Design a protein with these regions (language model features):
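N-terminal pro-sequences and low-complexity stem/linker regions of secreted or lumenal proteins
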Residues: 25-382
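Residue-level detector of intrinsically disordered/flexible regions characterized by low predicted structural confidence
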Residues: 6-8, 25
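Bacterial N-terminal signal peptides
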Residues: 8-19
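N-terminal secretory signal peptides that target proteins for export/translocation
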Residues: 1-4
Length: 382
């Protein structure tokens, strides 16, 4: 084969792996985003906006301290129920399917209803483990020469359940990592990276990038060792999912708030955050049983042929809110602009000048904008 022929094949292969990203031009970051070079996303569990940010909130650090330092997105929505479909959306732009809506109790391959990704960047079908042609934000960052890590609290704490790195249930088995034990409260349904072949098929890559939360402190010690994108998942007690927790702690928002009190100051004091960081704290979905539980925004629709809408009994995952803290955000900012998890992905992609994956590229969907960020220089940090 000639050198030219090999080059053509290499380009074709790269485009196939890039999948969704290949037909979506990268957006040039707006002025309020191109100052940010380190993003930290912390995802908590199962609370509505009213529970978290209402007058009787049991989470004063999140609802008062952090909002006074940053921005509160009052109309930020989840995109479905239960957990896994929301986590998948945050890093891939893929919508809910009937298996991710149920948190994939049986881990199966994704079965496409058609082999190609559609014009909206979706791979239609059902299943848990997405094929290699479904790209993630992690894949995009690597191709751009940028760094990422997923930090999972408790992962590998009980070595008989899962590894300390890249811990996940095996294909075609019942997932035993969906609930907490006294020795280990890690849940792989809250770790979106392990549901993509593009990540788990390279064991060394997955082990290096999907790690226990204990690694975060050392990584934050210098700008050079801090990933450009960090995705932080507490365990099933400290993310608020369980209440009470298996070890007797209260769980819910009380334990979530304590997790933030413990970890957010460490990030705030890190060189990377102080230079050019953005912290996003949000929830996967609203809690059950409320009128707003399945509310949606941003023209979200179900996948064609879906048996259920994204929220099972409604169009979305409920109004949950989000708090953003950054040297480039004025404390006490509040925005009523509608956003959702696809907006979060779109924002991260715009920050790093990446194409929009899946429904992050939906027409009319907005990245976090000037309603949130100020045009500030690094010398104006607070």
């Amino acid at each position: 084969m000639t050198g030219k022929g090999r080059l053509v094949l290499m380009i074709a292969f790269s485009m196939a792996i890039a999948g969704i990203a290949t037909n979506r031009a990268a957006a040039q970051p707006a002025g309020h985003l191109n100052q940010i070079h380190h993003v930290f996303v912390i995802v908590l569990e199962n609370k509505s906006f009213r529970e978290t940010f209402g007058p009787n909130s049991p989470a004063p650090y999140l609802s008062k301290t952090l909002t006074s330092r940053g921005a509160l997105l009052e109309n930020y929505f989840a995109i479905g129920h239960a957990s896994l479909d929301n986590y998948v959306a945050m890093i891939s732009g893929q919508p809910p399917n009937e298996d991710t809506q149920r948190d994939c109790p049986l881990v199966t391959e994704f079965v496409p209803s058609r082999p190609e990704i559609d014009a909206q960047g979706r791979l239609l079908g059902h299943g848990c483990l997405y094929p290699r042609n479904v790209a993630t934000l992690a894949d995009q960052l690597e191709r751009r020469g940028l760094t990422w890590r997923g930090y999972m609290q408790d992962m590998g704490k009980d070595a008989s359940r899962e590894k300390e790195t890249c811990g996940h249930a095996l294909l075609n088995t019942r997932d035993k990592l969906l609930t907490a034990t006294l020795s280990d409260a890690y849940a792989d349904k809250h770790n979106p990276f392990v549901y993509f072949h593009s990540i788990i098929d390279d064991q060394a890559k997955c082990d290096a990038h999907v790690v226990n939360l204990n690694a975060l402190k050392a990584d934050l010690s210098a700008i050079a060792s801090t990933p450009n994108f960090s995705f932080i998942t507490p365990n099933l007690c400290e993310d608020g999912h369980d209440h009470p927790c298996v070890d007797g702690r209260p769980g819910g928002l009380i334990s979530s708030d304590q997790f933030l009190r413990d970890w957010v100051p460490i990030i705030l004091n890190s060189p990377a955050y102080r230079s050019d960081g953005l912290i996003v704290v949000t929830f996967d979905e609203a809690g059950g049983g409320e009128a707003e539980d399945s509310a949606a925004c941003c023209n979200e629709v179900a996948m064609p042929g879906a048996r259920l809408p994204p929220g099972r009994n409604g169009p979305g995952g409920g109004r949950i809110g989000a708090v953003l803290v950054s040297p480039f955000i004025a404390g006490g900012t509040a925005s009523a602009q509608p956003y959702n998890h696809f907006s979060l992905l779109r924002t991260a992609e715009d920050i790093f000048n990446l194409p929009h994956l899946g429904l992050a590229g939906a027409p009319g969907l907005r990245a976090f904008g000037r309603d949130v960020f100020l045009q500030r220089t690094s010398s104006q940090q607070h």
